[in-house]
Regions:
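Positively charged, solvent-exposed patches that mediate nucleic-acid binding
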Residues: 1-135
Length: 135
């Protein structure tokens, strides 16, 4: 069970994470992540009615909550994550969800680590393009 301090509840937090975060999709879920240095790691879940009825949605959330707990233990500060369950998650077993979440986490963390380099690349490209036009 996630501690209350790690639960994301505000709509603004969900919006910020899903709109400006790194994203990684898998068969059963989509993971959005933003680095939040100095803040407690917060986790939010989006499980829509397309996943199934209330019982199925809650079962899916419980599984995902249990699977993300080790990440929160390892990284108690510095991240904001939103996990959106896709309809296939309702029929996925625990191992499939675990593999998808681990894979998505690895991918997103890799993207976040590469983000500063990517942010510098367009500037360098724009500078070289501008210089090329002057000749």
């Amino acid at each position: 069970m996630l501690a209350q301090q790690h639960r994301m509840r505000a709509k603004a937090q969900f919006s910020k994470t899903t709109r400006s975060g790194a994203r990684s999709g898998r068969r059963n879920l989509v993971l959005y992540t933003v680095k939040t240095p100095g803040e407690t790691t917060s986790i939010g879940f989006i499980v829509s009615k397309s996943v199934g009825n209330a019982v199925t949605r809650n079962k899916t959330k419980r599984r995902l909550r249990e699977l993300i707990t080790p990440f929160v233990s390892k990284h108690p500060n510095g991240y904001s994550l939103v996990i959106r369950a896709l309809p296939a998650a309702a029929h996925a077993d625990y191992l499939q969800l675990s593999n998808d979440l681990d894979s998505a986490l690895a991918s997103v963390l890799k993207k976040l680590d590469a983000a500063p380099v990517a942010a510098q690349s367009p500037e360098a490209t724009a500078t070289s393009t501008t210089q090329g036009e002057e000749h």
